[in-house]
């Protein structure tokens, strides 16, 4: 092999072509400093390669895949460099020290197989006068010398150097064939060196791979934006529905509380019925003022008398179109005779106080012995004259003393629907046969006492049954018309002793 290379060099010298590789070798041999530096450089990758531990099989597989991918990436670059105007051939020649230090430095830094990236394309500066065959021979000689120059680091160079050496030892039949083989070897060496160099770049190559990853399309980004907007709209709709539900709930609760408050206020005003809340009515205001003063004049009376009497007469005065007159029965025992007469008279006058006139007064005890029909006629005349003349109230004392037949006239004045005067008040008094009347007696018992007394007085089996006489049925009809309110009266000592001061 060496003899063939020497003969090729001799032929190249004879043909007038300059051998840059030989010149660079002569310079290296003559300079001892360069030789020592070359020896140091040769030892360094050996030691580094020996000291470096073997990588795991999985790591080697991953590196192999990465190198394959990156080599495929740079294949296009290598193909483009094979054009006739290849820039690698136009670079200035390199000396032997640079050729030997380039792979050794790469082995030291990267820990991989050295390659002849710089030796393949940068070391040859061909003379344009040389023939194609001379170029092929010089390329083969240069590749063999590069592979032989560092025998100690050949174990680490791997398959790339072996391929190059075997390629350099190819048949040399014909100068044209060797030239084409040399060009193919140069291109292959350049491609392998680029692939190995890129495989050793580490993080930079990973960044380039990341850049080659597919970037999300704008359509997917728009779809994600639309999904986010839809979710936001759904959340806003949920919040609005929640707010509406809360508003309806709170509104219903507030409305219910308002209705309850109005109802309670109405009930309270109905049962309390204070005088100042009553609409303005001159007759009513005058009655309330006079009736309020009676509590001081007649002490010791039950609260039932004042409350029920005031409400009953107030309701009648407040009615715009009353359907019947207001009829009240006051009753007392024998010890309260004067108090009964005086109290009933003041109540009737209080009712008609707005007209500035007194009430009509009839005493049944004075007409007890008279004819029933006569008394009936007289009572009718007095009541009709008084009501027609503006007297809005009448008092009939000792109603139980009137002749039984004469009391039938009160059908006319106390009827529920067909009363002769509906906007008036009739106050009747009944004196019980009992000497005293307990204050603890209930209103119901008082009403029964009065009813029993009238039945005993007005119904008599010996009296004839005629139109002008009283019977049980007629008395029942009369009782239903006059017994709307029965109130007991307790005696007042001053009035019983001194009489009623009208």
UniProtKB/Swiss-Prot annotation:
Glycans are attached at residue 318. Expressed in the spinal cord and liver (at protein level). GO terms for cellular component: endoplasmic reticulum; endoplasmic reticulum membrane; nuclear envelope. Residues 1-211 are annotated as: Disordered. It is a single-pass membrane protein. GO terms for biological process: endoplasmic reticulum organization; positive regulation of ATP-dependent activity; protein localization to nuclear envelope. The modification Phosphoserine is found at residues 24, 104, 131, 195. It is found in: Endoplasmic reticulum membrane; Nucleus envelope. Residues 59-99, 109-120, 154-165 have a biased composition (Basic and acidic residues). Residues 268-502 are lumenal. Keywords: Endoplasmic reticulum, Glycoprotein, Membrane, Nucleus, Phosphoprotein, Transmembrane, Transmembrane helix. Coiled coil: none annotated. Residues 1-246 are cytoplasmic. The chain crosses the membrane at residues 247-267. Residues 1-14, 23-58, 192-207 have a biased composition (Polar residues). One of its GO terms (molecular function) is ATPase activator activity. Gene3D superfamilies: 3.40.50.12190. The modification Phosphothreonine is found at residue 225. Residues 268-502 are annotated as: Interaction with TOR1A. Required for endoplasmic reticulum integrity. Regulates the distribution of TOR1A between the endoplasmic reticulum and the nuclear envelope as well as induces TOR1A, TOR1B and TOR3A ATPase activity. Belongs to the TOR1AIP family. Interacts with TOR1A and TOR1B (ATP-bound). This is Torsin-1A-interacting protein 2.
